[in-house]
């Protein structure tokens, strides 16, 4: 028999801190619940248990508190966000059939110990899942600890058996108790012996075997292992050491059920579990727990519905008229060998009244550009693509529920129709077995429209997000022409550069087998063999991340390693990556993502053209291979310092506004104000510092981050920041008010009314709260800039169409728009870009663009 025992409080704690704060649409925290259930699934897969017990601590004091008043006295209060989720975790575990174990006056650790001892007595295997290293003392031939850890921002489980404990700590599992009795434990406030730290404690136990062994040699002054001062402390604190041993020993006699079969997984209440998971918007977990076929229990807060009529299924009329709701049943994906393939394609359908019309491709085309039809759809992007591929525009599409869902909750990772129906509690007007979402479409869309109006986001939706979907579909359709032969030659050059750098690296390391892609080999070479400074140890060995290597760039080997990494990324990501996605027409048709970024910004993939490097000469050279077709040029318009101009507008700061209005260099002007210098005395270094502060303020950077950016001490950076805020008090006042308002209402807004919820601001955890404050500062500025460029895209696209020009908007990257224009239209296209981009808003500081043109993107930028 195999028993899995989970330390419920410990795993919940790991889950809470391992995942960023998640909330449901109505503001309930779910990150610990989501994380706990994910960890549970991993544990079940890893241990394959026959029985599962979940141990929880109770609030009442334990025998250890009675033994020592200071026990756990320094523990911080559990964050409210976690405390609210624990009862739900316990409820879900019960509904899924898992048995909870508690014992008044005892800790969860003792429950783990007692069940482990019971398994050992039966020669059964026991797996203890916990994030608490105290449980390692329980490891034995029959007991394995599955230790939940977090490293490099990722959670994982480390399997600790007897050999693993000995290898890591140099002592046996039981000797860990002796070690703790000497060094104490700050988290549990176990005192230990004054002056004995971790290193000394391990050394003493490794030498003498136990606490008793240490004291047996205490009077042997000829033994130099124990230093004189340590000997003195050991003698003085013997009672504390023995108390610490008792406090640190996990008991194995807790009054709980230890019988075989006591923790067999029961039936639970799967229907109620599914209902609760749906309520918590944990839809992905329903399938992972194998509950997809379970009908959820009725919502206790909603009155039982009358039996619903069945839908009528019909073929789409030859001449459809009126208003239809259009959506798709998602494609069914599955494994074919090791590949993920589409087992069943997405299937579109239309709803009118109580009639459902399955739609073939020709049916869709009869609806999408039909003057007698209007369509409310869910996910317009593929529909616009179909219409445009057939020579139309998708002009019948009047509203998109997916875009509405994004505006109403930008924090969601995806927008699934079935899940939204549950989240909005949309009522079905009829049932339809083949198209199960069809009956609730009308109520879902109505509720979304009502909510958008209530949140005053109608203008944002109607003027920006909805029309932008058509623009993006057209841009994807057109694509951008690339010089394939040029990219291939660039790739040959890259590979040659890579070989040259690798040869230098091998010469510098003295090893032809040295692999610069191996973090282990690189760390050992830099910090063990060469003894370079700034080394940081992680659980996996020496850190060799970009920040660590940048601090060592002055060393020739490190400079070559960084060069090697840069060339390698250029070659694999951009050269080889771009060559794979060139279509038959010689163009790259990147896909724009409208519903991903919480700030409202666009992203792109397949390929991601937002990240084409521009800071290095070789990186920027890639842009030369994005070209205009014969007889055309690329016209490139880029906003100049749009975020700083928005900052000047929203803060009302006269100094900042004046600098922009008079055409001064804003960073030079800022430096002059901060340092009290005439403009002509501002050095490049001071300007660079001011530039870093200007942007750092918006992104919520503190003195430490700023010091890294401008290469000064933290103290100097702190002085710069204080000087800046004193010089521009309205900026400081605006930031403070933004955070205060966000705390009060739970969100921030752009100037266009786009909302971003910030549950992080309510956290008791300082780091989480600080992250929320940074987002509160940044989102209104960055989000407004995103809204502005989206609006400009819509206006530019419409102008080019309305004026019947051949010029086409083909690409956007951050604050930049690119039009492919016939040479004869280039000047007019440039004028339209400038007029629409600068004229789409009326702010206290006018927006400014820089417009250039060329045969390729590098020339035009």
Where are these regions (language model features)?
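Active-site palm subdomain of RNA-directed nucleic acid polymerases
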Residues: 452-464, 468, 788, 792-813, ...
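Function-dense linear segments that define catalytic or interfacial modules
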Residues: 353, 402-431, 438-441, 594-678
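Charged catalytic and DNA/RNA-contacting regions of genome-maintenance
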Residues: 126-129, 136-174, 344-347, 352, ...
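Conserved "right-hand" nucleotidyltransferase catalytic core of DNA-directed polymerases
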Residues: 237-359, 374, 434-437, 442-614, ...
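Extended two-metal-dependent nuclease catalytic cores across DNA- and RNA-processing enzymes
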Residues: 22-23, 73-256
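Conserved RNase H-like, two-metal-ion catalytic cores of nucleic-acid enzymes
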Residues: 3-4, 8, 14-53, 69-70, ...
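C-terminal polymerase-core module
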Residues: 496-503, 507, 511-558, 726-774, ...
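Conserved catalytic core of nucleic-acid polymerases
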Residues: 477, 589-590, 594-597, 672-805, ...
């Amino acid at each position: 028999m195999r028993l899995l025992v989970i330390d419920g409080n410990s795993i919940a704690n790991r889950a809470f801190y391992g995942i960023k704060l998640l909330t449901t649409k109505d503001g309930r925290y779910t990150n610990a619940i989501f994380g706990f259930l994910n960890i549970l699934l991993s544990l079940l897969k890893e241990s394959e248990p026959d029985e599962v017990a979940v141990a929880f601590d109770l609030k009442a004091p334990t025998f250890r508190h009675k033994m020592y008043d200071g026990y756990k006295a320094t523990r911080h209060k559990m964050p409210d966000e976690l405390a609210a989720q624990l009862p739900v975790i316990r409820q879900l575990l019960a509904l899924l059939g898992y048995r909870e174990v508690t014992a008044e006056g005892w800790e969860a650790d003792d429950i783990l110990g007692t069940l482990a001892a019971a398994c050992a007595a039966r020669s059964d295997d026991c797996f203890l899942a916990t994030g608490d290293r105290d449980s390692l003392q329980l490891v034995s031939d029959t007991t394995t600890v599955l230790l939940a850890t977090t490293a490099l921002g990722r959670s994982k489980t480390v399997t600790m058996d007897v050999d693993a404990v000995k290898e890591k700590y140099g002592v046996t599992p039981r000797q860990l108790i002796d070690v703790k009795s000497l060094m104490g434990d700050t988290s549990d406030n176990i005192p230990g012996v004054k002056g004995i730290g971790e290193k000394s404690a391990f050394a003493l136990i490794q030498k003498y075997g136990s606490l008793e062994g240490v004291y047996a040699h205490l009077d042997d002054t000829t033994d130099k292992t124990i230093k004189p001062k340590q000997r003195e402390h050991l003698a003085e604190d013997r009672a504390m050491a023995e108390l610490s041993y008792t406090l640190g020993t996990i008991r194995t006699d807790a009054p709980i059920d230890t019988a075989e079969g006591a923790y067999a997984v029961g039936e639970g209440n799967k229907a109620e579990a599914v209902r609760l998971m749906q309520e918590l918007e944990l839809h992905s977990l329903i399938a992972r727990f194998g509950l997809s076929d379970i009908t959820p229990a009725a919502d206790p807060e909603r009155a039982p519905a009358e039996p619903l009529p069945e839908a009528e299924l019909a073929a789409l009329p030859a001449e459809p008229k009126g208003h239809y709701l259009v959506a798709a049943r998602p494609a069914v994906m599955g494994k074919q060998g090791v590949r993920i393939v589409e087992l069943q394609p997405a299937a579109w359908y239309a709803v009118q009244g109580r009639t459902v019309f399955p739609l073939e491709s020709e049916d869709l085309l009869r609806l999408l550009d039909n003057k007698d039809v209007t369509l409310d759809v869910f996910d317009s992007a593929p529909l616009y693509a179909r219409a445009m591929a057939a020579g139309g525009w998708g002009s019948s599409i009047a509203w998109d529920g997916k875009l509405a869902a994004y505006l109403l909750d930008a924090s969601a990772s995806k927008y699934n129709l079935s899940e939204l129906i549950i989240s909005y509690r949309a009522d079905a007007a009829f049932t339809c077995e083949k198209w199960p979402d069809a009956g609730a479409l009308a109520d879902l869309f109505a509720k979304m429209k009502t909510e958008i109006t209530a949140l005053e986001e109608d203008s944002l939706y109607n003027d920006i997000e909805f029309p932008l979907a058509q623009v993006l579909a057209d841009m994807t359709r057109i694509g951008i022409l690339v010089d394939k032969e040029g990219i291939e030659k660039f790739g040959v050059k890259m590979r040659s550069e890579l070989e040259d750098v690798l040869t230098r690296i091998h010469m510098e390391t003295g090893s032809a087998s040295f692999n610069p892609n191996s973090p282990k080999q690189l760390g050992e070479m830099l910090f063990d063999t060469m003894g370079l400074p700034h080394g940081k140890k992680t659980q996996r060995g020496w850190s060799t991340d970009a920040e660590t290597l940048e601090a060592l760039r002055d060393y020739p080997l490190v400079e070559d390693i960084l060069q090697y990494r840069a060339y390698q990324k250029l070659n694999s990501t951009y050269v080889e990556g771009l060559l794979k996605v060139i279509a038959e027409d010689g163009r790259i048709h990147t896909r724009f993502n409208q519903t991903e970024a919480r700030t409202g910004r666009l992203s792109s993939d397949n390929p991601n053209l937002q990240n084409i490097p521009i800071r290095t000469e070789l990186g920027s050279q890639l842009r030369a291979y994005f070209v205009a077709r014969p007889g055309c040029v690329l016209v490139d318009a880029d906003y100049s310092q749009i975020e700083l101009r928005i900052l000047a507008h929203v803060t009302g700061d006269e100094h900042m506004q004046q600098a922009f209005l008079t055409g001064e260099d804003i960073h030079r002007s800022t430096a002059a104000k901060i340092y009290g210098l005439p403009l002509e005395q501002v050095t490049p270094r001071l300007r660079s510092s001011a530039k870093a502060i200007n942007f750092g303020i918006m992104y919520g950077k503190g003195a430490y981050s700023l010091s890294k950016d401008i290469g000064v001490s933290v103290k100097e950076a702190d002085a710069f920041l204080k000087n800046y805020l004193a010089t521009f008090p309205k900026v400081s006042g605006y930031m403070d008010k933004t955070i205060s308002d966000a705390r009060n209402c739970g969100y921030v807004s752009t100037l266009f009314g786009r909302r971003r919820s910030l549950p992080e601001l309510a956290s008791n955890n300082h780091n989480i709260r600080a992250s929320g404050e940074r987002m509160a500062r940044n989102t209104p500025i960055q989000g407004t800039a995103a809204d502005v460029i989206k609006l400009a895209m819509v206006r530019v696209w419409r102008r080019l169409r309305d004026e019947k020009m051949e010029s086409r908007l083909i690409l956007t990257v951050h604050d930049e728009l690119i039009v492919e224009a016939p040479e004869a239209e280039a000047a007019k296209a440039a004028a339209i870009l400038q007029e629409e981009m600068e004229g789409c808003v009326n702010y206290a500081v006018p927006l400014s663009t820089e417009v250039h043109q060329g045969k390729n993107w590098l020339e035009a930028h």
